C-alpha cells in the first residue's frame, strides 16, 4: 500500500449544448466543473497562460467541500517520483504566495504556513516499501531523513515507538501545513484578477456543456458526471485531542 495521495483531473472535449439553471451560456475555451482547491488552482494556472476560464461551483460557501476539512499538509514524502517532484513544486509555490497571489483587493495574501515538517511512522508490515520509497526520495533530493524505530523516542520523547520499525522525517522547512481555506481564497482571488469567472450552478451532465476543453475538478463527486472514471469517495477522519503539554515544534505526524 503506497502512502501517495492521488487526485484526478479529467480533460474532455465536447460540442454539445450547455445549459445551467435554464440559462444558456456559450463557452469558447475552458470550463472547470468544481470550484474547490483543484478547480481554483486550475483556473489560476490556465488563466495565467492566457486561457479564458469559467468555473462552475454549486456551493460558493464551500460548506460541503472537502478542502476546508483538510489538515492542509504539504509534503514531498511520496513513493512515486512524479508526486515527490510535485511536492517540491508545491513547497516553492507556497513560499511565494505573497508575491504570486498578490492582488489589488488582497495585497498581502497568506496561507498561515507552518514548516514543522512531516513525521511518518511505519510498522514492520510497511517498512520495506518505505525503504524503497526512500531511494526515490534520494534521487529526487527530497531531503528526507530515515529514523530507526528504536531511535524515535530519543528525538521525539513524547512518542511511544512501540511497534514502529522505521520513520521518515524532514526538518529543512520543506514540509508542513497551511490553512486550506486561506490558500483557496488567495488562489481564487488571483484567478479572478487574471480573468477567470466563477459561476454558481450545478452541472448534471457533461453534455450540458459546450467548450473546447472541460476539466472535471469535482473530486469525490466525479462519478456523478463521469461514471466510467474510477474516482470514488474515500472517508478520512481527523480527531482533535487536547495535549497535556503544547509542543510548538511538533511535526505533522502520521502512523
Describe every region a protein language model picked out.
Residues 38, 61, 221:
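Conserved Rossmann-like nucleotide-cofactor binding loop
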Residues 30-54:
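N-terminal Rossmann-like FAD-binding beta1-loop-alpha1 element of flavoenzymes
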Residues 48-66:
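Glycine-rich FAD pyrophosphate-binding loop
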Residues 201-206:
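Conserved SAM/SAH-binding loop
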Residues 71-155:
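Dinucleotide-binding Rossmann-like beta1-alpha1 core, especially the glycine-rich loop
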Residues 41, 89-92, 97, 101-105, ...:
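Flavin-dependent oxidoreductases
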Residues 28, 207-213:
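Core beta-strand elements of the Rossmann-like FAD/NAD(P) dinucleotide-binding domain
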Residues 96, 121-200:
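Flavin (FAD/FMN) cofactor-binding and adjacent substrate-gating region
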Amino acid at each position: 500500500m503506497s502512502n501517495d495521495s492521488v487526485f484526478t483531473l479529467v480533460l474532455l472535449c465536447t460540442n454539445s449544448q450547455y445549459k445551467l439553471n435554464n440559462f444558456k451560456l456559450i463557452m469558447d475555451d475552458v470550463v472547470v466543473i468544481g470550484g474547490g482547491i483543484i478547480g481554483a488552482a486550475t483556473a489560476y494556472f490556465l488563466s495565467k497562460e492566457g486561457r479564458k476560464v469559467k468555473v462552475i461551483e454549486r456551493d460558493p460557501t464551500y460548506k460541503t467541500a472537502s478542502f476546508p476539512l483538510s489538515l492542509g499538509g504539504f509534503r514531498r514524502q511520496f513513493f512515486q517520483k512524479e508526486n515527490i517532484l510535485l511536492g517540491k513544486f508545491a513547497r516553492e509555490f507556497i513560499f511565494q504566495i505573497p508575491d504570486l497571489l498578490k492582488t489589488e483587493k488582497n495585497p498581502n495574501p497568506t496561507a498561515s504556513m507552518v514548516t514543522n515538517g512531516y513525521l511518518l511512522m511505519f510498522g514492520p508490515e510497511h517498512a520495506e516499501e518505505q525503504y524503497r520509497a526512500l531511494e526515490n526520495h534520494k534521487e529526487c533530493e527530497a531531503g528526507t531523513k530515515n529514523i530507526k524505530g528504536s531511535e524515535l523516542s530519543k528525538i521525539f520523547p513524547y512518542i511511544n515507538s512501540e511497534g514502529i520499525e522505521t520513520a521518515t522525517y524532514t526538518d529543512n522547512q520543506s514540509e508542513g501545513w497551511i490553512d486550506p481555506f486561506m490558500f483557496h481564497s488567495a488562489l481564487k482571488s488571483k484567478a479572478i484578477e487574471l480573468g477567470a469567472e466563477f459561476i454558481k450552478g450545478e452541472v448534471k451532465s457533461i453534455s450540458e456543456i459546450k467548450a473546447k476543453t472541460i476539466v472535471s475538478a469535482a473530486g469525490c463527486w466525479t462519478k456523478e458526471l463521469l461514471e466510467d472514471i474510477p474516482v470514488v469517495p474515500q472517508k478520512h477522519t481527523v480527531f482533535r485531542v487536547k495535549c497535556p503539554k503544547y509542543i510548538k515544534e511538533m511535526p505533522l505526524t502520521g502512523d
